[in-house]
Amino acid sequence: MSDISPQDQARILSEALPHMQQYDEETIVIKYGGHAMGEEHLAREFARDIVLLEQTAINPVVVHGGGPQIATMLGRLGIKSEFAAGLRITDASAIEIVEMVLAGSINKQIVSHINAAGGKAVGLSGKDGNMVTAVKATRTMIDPDSNIEKVIDLGFVGEPDKVDLALLNQLIGHELIPVLAPLAVSTDGQTYNVNADTFAGAVAGALRAKRLLLLTDVAGVLDKSKKLIPELSIKDARRLIADGTISGGMIPKVETCIYALEAGVEGVVILDGKTPHAVLLELFTNQGTGTLIYK
């Protein structure tokens, strides 16, 4: 804010007050990923913004991805990355690397950034305290040669089955900031890699969060002329999926939004994590940013 006059700084803070009051003591789940996580200056800005939320009596819960970092590490080790239905096929050798990168390197880096900014973050995965239990994910696709539907074996890729809030509520109650890697465990102890958007949606739904923010590399949901759609109801979102306006990788993100809303989240926003202070712009300004999806 160095280029802003003191008077404008005061006005901005004053205008943010009703928004801060709206979110007082509420839980906000933020899915953090994409290029915003890979660029150091954006990563540090994000950490400061998370600390600011906590300092204004908001309970932030961070869920992070790590696809590019996983791909880089697998490549270094000579393990080929394969995808099906938008999900990384994760075999026995890959799941160890995925866990190392997500729960080790990335998670602890985010925790360090938040703590350096004055927060008290705790890094965990869904395995800790059996927080998130998962079942094996299944997908089908049509074989182009035979035109027969086939089941795809995704390996150790899971979908959330149950979220136990005991540990999360303890952390939030002690004013700690949970930073969660999207790993889960099955009832027989098997580790599963879970899509970060899906993981965040499950956690937000279980917490009945005030907001779920999905930080991406795009401005939000776009119409057919590539213009941002500021707001969508669930009904509108389903219609845009059906007519092809929402397509490709945006479909599972919007489906996660719908799931979270139906599970009790008040509002979900898809926004561009590359925008400086995107989280603050969404929560503390009248205009907001990205696409708000609501019931």
Curated annotation (Swiss-Prot):
Kinase keyword on record: yes
Annotated pathway: Amino-acid biosynthesis; L-arginine biosynthesis; N(2)-acetyl-L-ornithine from L-glutamate: step 2/4
Predominant localisation class: cytoplasm
Reaction catalyzed: N-acetyl-L-glutamate + ATP = N-acetyl-L-glutamyl 5-phosphate + ADP
One matching Pfam family: AA_kinase
CDD domains, per the entry: AAK_NAGK-C
Record-marked site positions (Transition state stabilizer): K31, K253
Residues binding substrate: G66, G67, R88, N193
One record GO biological process: L-arginine biosynthetic process
Enzyme Commission identifier(s): 2.7.2.8
InterPro entries named among the record's database cross-references: AceGlu_kinase-like_sf (IPR036393), AcgluKinase_fam (IPR004662), ArgB (IPR037528), Asp/Glu/Uridylate_kinase (IPR001048), NAGK-C (IPR041727)
A single Gene Ontology CC term: cytoplasm
Enzyme class: transferase
GO molecular function per UniProt: acetylglutamate kinase activity; ATP binding
This protein's UniProt keywords: Amino-acid biosynthesis, Arginine biosynthesis, ATP-binding, Cytoplasm, Kinase, Nucleotide-binding, Transferase
Homology family: Belongs to the acetylglutamate kinase family. ArgB subfamily.
Function: Catalyzes the ATP-dependent phosphorylation of N-acetyl-L-glutamate.
Stored HAMAP family: ArgB
Protein name (Swiss-Prot/TrEMBL): Acetylglutamate kinase
Gene that specifies this protein: argB
